[in-house]
UniProtKB/Swiss-Prot annotation:
Function in brief: GPI-anchored cell wall protein involved in cell wall organization, hyphal growth, as well as in host-fungal interaction and virulence.
Positions bearing carbohydrate: N36, N367, N686, N732, N790, N818, N825, N884, N917
Propeptide, residue positions: 918-941
Organism: Candida albicans (strain SC5314 / ATCC MYA-2876) (Yeast)
InterPro entries (alphabetical): Cell_wall_rpt, Hyphal-reg_cell_wall_N
Location within or outside the cell: Secreted, Cell wall; Membrane
This protein's name: Cell wall protein IFF3
Modified how: The GPI-anchor is attached to the protein in the endoplasmic reticulum and serves to target the protein to the cell surface. There, the glucosamine-inositol phospholipid moiety is cleaved off and the GPI-modified mannoprotein is covalently attached via its lipidless GPI glycan remnant to the 1,6-beta-glucan of the outer cell wall layer.
Gene name of the record: IFF3
Length: 941
């Protein structure tokens, strides 16, 4: 039997050794992960992130060292975490960070860790969404927490948190944070730690028979947090911090007083709050400083706890100041983000052996992302092998394309960039001399395709050199046969080196907008690429020259020497092609006979400790920068000129610019316009009363527009309307009425606009200002045939009417009483006869001011509302009155004589004077007479 036990123990130990998982570097696994019968150890500085593994079961022990991390998380809405450790003979020890995060999931999560012991000296996080009830249980027989345990839900549910073996004990000397969670106590609580309730959290002491250490603390941080204690005969005192602002402390049964004590009592001296139900009570040390009048019995109805009606007390006031214990001062940190939970991209290198037996190293890019459903997938893109591709090099000189060639070039794909920003030769040489070559053939070459010079650059600014330098040892590769040509676009300045070129090639460019010279020669182990990242001023000149040299017979191959000249600076580099002799570029200082110090550069050959100067670079001569050419440009512009009469005219044309000189090449003639420009013409209208019985309009000073409209006579003039002819688009008129050389009415100003419609009809809009009050109206010009009958006489006439859509009418009466016409109604006009209404259309001359004179008529007869008499001695004026909805104008009075109509503008205009006669009192009497006659005949019959 003993032998059998020894065999089992040996097998168990061997199994642990064989299946142990040790994490020594950062590791990310996505999808299903099988842990087998493995002990898991994560060492300092390393982390293991398991993503979207629906069920994770630890069978062996779990040991997370200090500075290490274990992350199990879900990134799918449909995938919740189920994490368990079911090996009762193994332990859980955390000295780093352990995080189980299922907050994004919309299903129920479960965390169940059971072992022989549980020890947390670091940080542990257990997070769920809370959309469904979740459970968390750390039920080891030996349970100790000295740092931070955080239990988090997005929202509160009926799920609870259990710590320790039921009816056992836990030791808490650290911080236990609850966020929208319910902690249900099922064990004794030892230690001097802290339970902190954040958000909508509750601390539920469900079994007070299991003692809680008097040094244990309970901290309520929010108004939604609460604490509830079972009410039994065993009374305990609980240390509570943060009570106030509406949070609650209660019992599992309703609060009720007895004959001697009330349902609750607060001792202001000791700070003890006592809650009781008859003879059962529990005490809470909330501290001093509370106002007894602000306590109130309430009901705590949160999820996951017994809902007791009126079983709790709330304090509706500020929390008195009180020092928190050190354990409660440990911050409740947010849930950490697990590594690898966001899409990422990285470069990988693979070494393999091809069919020829050669070792081939391949590189590629790995993309890790998720699909629409949240599932992870990985895509690996490998860099292809070297190939040769033709490239076109175009050389530009000034503004003319000089030549185009198509060489074959071999270049290396860009794998790794080593950018170096420098502004001096010394910095560049320092970087080159201190760089250590890499064992891997990581190359970065940009392929230029053209050289371009622009003569339009005039700005001057500082420049810096962006140097991309890549080195590789010859042992890593000897040829460029395993790399692909890379040809970037939009390169302003570059020089191509043919694959078989052995001659020198030089390109000079000024005012570089973006210069990126680079070159590659195959079968070389040293490659140098220089580029100017910032635009250069027009005064700088770059010269890039390439020379292929051959060493002594002891050399293994050709050596490439490159130099870059910028003004008086020269950079040169050489490569080592022999293990015996080494050549390199160096800079040194020498003192001349006159004591001046000169800096020189050249190529140094080193063999052992012997140094020999092979070549000394000559100082770069002064470079003559050709002056930029002045380009003449032509463009269209608009300008204003002032005429001799001080009027301002706007002109446009073609302008030629040479440097800062502007010359007008062509002036565009004014474009003809079908629209007559608008203008304003004021008139002064003076009126007086004449005794003549007829109205005569003389058009001698005007151009006749219509033969039938040239002149007209009428008796008993009662109204006249000034209308702008269709040739005008807008005209303003103003008038003042004079009676015996005195102003008899307020000034009247009119603004009239004429519009011609597609059907040939005309419309007029008039705005009348009387004493600065605007009276806008819209009119239409209508030509109609009117039949007028007086007694037995009838006549027809073609009349031009001005109709109004809506207009307010004001009539100014005599000095004894003014008659006001409201609502577009006007008094009847009394006269002796009824005649036709005609219109006269006249065009004003474009010459100097003309005058329309000798317009006379009969005395106006206006009916007075009070006396029904006719006034002919007082002056009366009225604007046009129109019935609502009517399209024809109603007669109104106007001044009898119109004189001194003086246009202030010399432009051509036309006016139409329409005058109408109204009905008279005699016609009304005739109608009454006829009515009586007819009525008498009917009675007689």
């Amino acid at each position: 039997m003993q032998l059998f036990q020894n065999i089992l123990v040996s097998i168990a130990l061997l199994t642990q050794v064989v299946f142990a998982i040790e994490i020594t570097e950062n590791k990310v696994d996505r999808g299903t992960v099988t842990l087998n019968l493995s002990d898991i150890t994560i060492y300092p500085g390393a982390s293991w992130s398991i993503i979207d593994n629906a069920y994770t079961s630890f069978v062996g022990k779990l040991d997370v060292r200090d500075g290490a991390g274990l992350y199990i998380s879900s990134t799918s809405h449909l995938l919740a975490l189920q994490v368990s450790l079911t090996a009762l003979l193994h332990s859980i020890t955390n000295n780093g960070v352990v995080s189980f995060d299922s907050r994004i999931s919309r299903t129920s999560s479960s965390y169940d860790l059971r072992g022989v012991s549980f020890t947390n000296n670091g940080e542990m996080y257990f997070a769920a969404s809370g959309e469904f009830s979740s459970s968390t249980a750390l039920t080891s027989a030996s349970w100790t927490n000295t740092r931070l345990l955080s239990f988090y839900q997005n929202q509160r549910t009926s799920g609870t948190v259990s710590l320790g073996m039921p009816l056992g004990s836990i030791t808490n000397n650290g911080q236990v944070c609850l966020n929208n969670q319910v902690y249900e106590q099922t064990t004794q609580i030892k230690g001097s730690g802290c339970f902190t309730a954040n958000g909508d959290s509750t601390i539920y002491i469900s079994n007070v028979l299991l003692a809680v250490s008097p040094k244990q603390n309970f901290y309520l941080t929010d108004k939604g947090s609460s604490m509830i204690v079972q009410a039994v005969s065993t009374t305990q005192t609980f240390n509570v911090y943060g009570f106030g602002e509406g949070n609650k402390i209660g019992l599992t049964i309703p609060l009720m007083g007895n004959l001697w004590n009330s349902a609750y009592a607060y001792d202001t001296t000791s700070g003890i709050l006592t809650l009781r139900n008859l003879l059962l009570e529990q005490k809470f040390n909330i501290g001093t400083g509370y106002d007894p009048s602000k306590f109130q019995v309430v009901t705590d109805s949160g999820s996951g706890i017994p809902s007791t009606i009126l079983g709790s007390v709330a304090y509706y006031g500020r929390v008195p100041e009180r020092t928190l214990p050190k354990s409660c001062q440990i911050p409740c940190k947010p849930i950490p983000e697990a590594p690898g939970t966001t899409p990422t991209q990285y470069t990988t290198t693979i070494t393999k052996t091809n069919t020829a037996g050669n070792t081939v190293t391949e590189s590629g890019v790995v993309n890790v992302s998720t699909d629409k459903g949240g599932s992870w997938f990985t895509t690996t893109s490998m860099f292809p092998a070297l190939s040769t591709a033709p490239s076109t090099a175009t050389v530009f000189s000034s503004d003319t394309i000089m030549s185009t060639v198509e060489p074959d070039t071999t270049e290396l794909a860009s794998l790794t960039d080593i950018p170096i920003e420098t502004s001096s030769v010394e910095e560049l040489l320092s970087v080159m001399s201190n760089w250590e070559p890499s064992s891997a053939p990581t190359l970065s070459i940009e392929t230029p395709v053209s050289s371009h010079h622009s003569s339009m650059q005039h700005s001057s600014f500082e420049s810096s050199a962006d140097i991309n330098t890549v080195f590789s040892s010859e042992s890593a590769f000897e040829t460029a046969s395993d790399y692909i040509v890379s040809t970037p676009s939009s390169i302003s300045h570059s020089t191509m080196v043919p694959q078989s070129s052995v001659s020198a090639l030089s390109v000079v460019s000024e005012s570089l907008a973006s210069a990126e010279p680079s070159f590659v020669v195959p079968s070389e182990s040293f490659i140098f690429s220089a580029s100017s990242a910032a635009p250069q001023p027009s005064s700088s000149t770059y010269s890039v020259s390439f020379t292929t040299q051959f060493e002594t017979p002891s050399s293994a191959g050709p050596s490439l020497v490159t130099s870059v000249e910028s003004n008086t600076e020269l950079i040169s580099s050489a490569t080592q092609s022999s293990d015996i002799q080494t050549e390199f570029t160096s800079t040194w200082t020498t003192t001349n006979s006159d004591g001046s110090v000169v800096t020189e550069s050249g190529i140094i050959s080193q063999s052992g400790t012997s140094l020999t100067t092979l070549t000394t670079f000559q100082p770069a001569t002064s470079l003559v920068v050709p002056p930029y050419s002045v380009i003449e440009t032509e463009f269209t512009s608009t300008w204003t000129t002032t005429n001799s009469d001080s009027s301002v005219a706007t002109e446009s044309g073609v302008v030629s610019q040479s440097d800062t000189l502007l010359t007008t090449v062509t002036t565009f003639p004014p474009a003809p316009s079908a629209i007559v420009p608008e203008f304003t013409s004021p008139w002064k209208i003076n009126t007086s009363i004449e005794s003549s019985e007829t109205l005569t309009v003389s058009a001698s000073s005007y151009e006749t527009v219509g033969e039938s409209l040239a002149a007209a006579t009428s008796s008993y003039l009662s109204s006249a309307t000034v209308v702008v002819a269709p040739s005008e688009s807008e005209i303003n008129t103003s008038s003042s009425i004079l009676n015996n050389e005195e102003i008899a009415s307020a000034p009247v100003s009119d603004t009239t606009s004429i519009a011609e419609h597609h059907d040939g009809s005309l419309s007029m809009t008039t705005t009348e200002f009387v004493n600065s009050n605007s009276l806008p109206s819209s009119h239409s010009i209508v030509t109609a045939t009117i039949t007028s009958c007086n007694k037995s006489k009838c006549s027809e006439s073609v009349v031009t009417y001005v109709s109004s859509v809506s207009c307010a009418t004001i009539t100014v009466g005599d000095s004894e009483k003014n008659s006001s016409i409201v609502g577009n109604n006007i008094s009847s006009i009394v006269g002796d006869d009824v005649s036709n209404t005609q219109a006269i259309t006249m065009a004003t001359s474009t010459e100097s001011a003309t005058t329309l004179t000798s317009v006379s008529g009969a005395k106006p007869s206006v009916a007075n509302d009070a006396t029904n008499s006719v006034h002919t001695t007082d002056y009366t004026t009225a604007t046009t009155g129109v019935q609502n909805g009517s399209s024809l104008s109603i007669p109104s009075d106007i001044p009898i004589e119109i004189s001194d109509i003086t246009p202030t503008d010399s432009s051509s205009s036309a006016v139409t004077i329409s005058y109408e006669n109204g009905s008279n009192k005699e016609s009304i009497e005739n109608i009454k007479y006829l009515t009586l006659v007819v009525f008498g005949l009917m009675m007689f019959m």
